[in-house]
């Protein structure tokens, strides 16, 4: 089963991706994770990507397509995969089709912008462990401190409100057209397309996705 997850940054795609991956036994291919790994490793591409992401911009198609093509050629993708955060644009979707990468089901998780701003700008991260908190939904025991080590929590540059709003603007401009694109592909019978209300509970959204995929 080859699945694409669509939705704005902060819509909860990562959480649902985890559910789908475990439930169906297919790997999640998150361009964000691939990019963060490159940034952490300090590779030339990683450093270039960090500069772009910190400014709230999107990295080049060339870099992302190279990473994705390499990844889905691996053995664990033989039974399918879940793409999270790719394609972002119609040219990327066209490039996938041109490379013979067919998709069985496209899932969109829809959340209003203001809800996303509240979700993302409230995130706090412990740099040493990667533990993530939220000032409203999952606060640390002591404000601004990691529960385990007591060390300071930080706001990732891409969780700053101004950066979140900039990324949402880019999403609406570049990625929203994919909704129409895959709607047409589905109408032609070449994939299935389902939209979900992402403001519902995580468990409810998971249940609805499972029903749509079965």
UniProtKB/Swiss-Prot annotation:
- InterPro entries in UniProt: Adenyl_kin_sub, Adenylat/UMP-CMP_kin, Adenylat_kinase_CS, Adenylate_kinase_lid-dom, P-loop_NTPase
Q: In which pathway does it act?
A: Purine metabolism; AMP biosynthesis via salvage pathway; AMP from ADP: step 1/1
UniProt entry keywords in alphabetical sequence: ATP-binding, Cytoplasm, Kinase, Nucleotide biosynthesis, Nucleotide-binding, Transferase
Record GO terms (molecular function): adenylate kinase activity; ATP binding
Assigned GO CC terms: cytoplasm
Q: Report the EC number(s), separated by commas if there are several.
A: 2.7.4.3
Q: Which GO terms describe its biological process?
A: AMP salvage
Catalytic activity annotated for this protein? AMP + ATP = 2 ADP
Q: Does the keyword Magnesium apply?
A: no
The positions annotated for binding AMP are 31, 36, 57-59, 85-88, 92, 156, 167
Q: Which SUPFAM superfamilies match?
A: P-loop containing nucleoside triphosphate hydrolases
Stretch list, region LID? 122-159
Write down a Pfam family by its short name. Answer: ADK
Subcellular compartments: Cytoplasm
Positions with a binding annotation for ATP: 10-15, 123, 132-133, 200
The answer, when asked if RNA-binding is one of the entry's keywords, is no
Subunit-level organization? Monomer.
Under the heading PANTHER family, the entry gives: NUCLEOTIDE KINASE
- What job does this protein perform? Catalyzes the reversible transfer of the terminal phosphate group between ATP and AMP. Plays an important role in cellular energy homeostasis and in adenine nucleotide metabolism.
Please state what the annotation says regarding this protein's domains: Consists of three domains, a large central CORE domain and two small peripheral domains, NMPbind and LID, which undergo movements during catalysis. The LID domain closes over the site of phosphoryl transfer upon ATP binding. Assembling and dissambling the active center during each catalytic cycle provides an effective means to prevent ATP hydrolysis.
Question: What name is this protein filed under?
Answer: Adenylate kinase
Q: Name the species this protein comes from.
A: Shewanella amazonensis (strain ATCC BAA-1098 / SB2B)
Encoding gene, per UniProt annotation: adk
């Amino acid at each position: 089963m080859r699945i694409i997850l669509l939705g704005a940054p902060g819509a909860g795609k990562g959480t649902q991706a985890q559910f789908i991956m475990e439930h169906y036994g297919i790997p999640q291919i998150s361009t964000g994770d691939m990019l963060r790994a490159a940034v952490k490793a300090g590779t030339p591409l990683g450093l270039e990507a960090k500069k772009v992401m910190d400014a709230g911009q999107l990295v080049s198609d060339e870099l992302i397509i190279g990473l994705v093509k390499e990844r889905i050629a691996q053995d664990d993708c033989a039974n399918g995969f879940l793409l999270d955060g790719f394609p972002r644009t119609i040219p990327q979707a066209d490039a996938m089709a041109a490379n013979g990468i067919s998709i069985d089901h496209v899932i969109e998780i829809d959340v209003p912008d203001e809800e996303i701003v509240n979700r993302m700008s409230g995130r706090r991260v412990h740099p040493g462990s990667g533990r993530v908190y939220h000032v409203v939904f999952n606060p640390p025991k002591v404000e601004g401190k990691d529960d385990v080590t007591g060390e300071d929590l930080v706001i990732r540059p891409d969780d700053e409100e101004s950066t979140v709003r900039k990324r949402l603007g880019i999403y609406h401009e570049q990625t929203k057209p994919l909704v129409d694109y895959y709607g047409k592909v589905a109408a032609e019978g070449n994939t299935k397309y389902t939209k979900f209300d992402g403001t519902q509970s995580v468990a409810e959204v998971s249940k609805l996705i499972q029903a749509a995929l079965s």
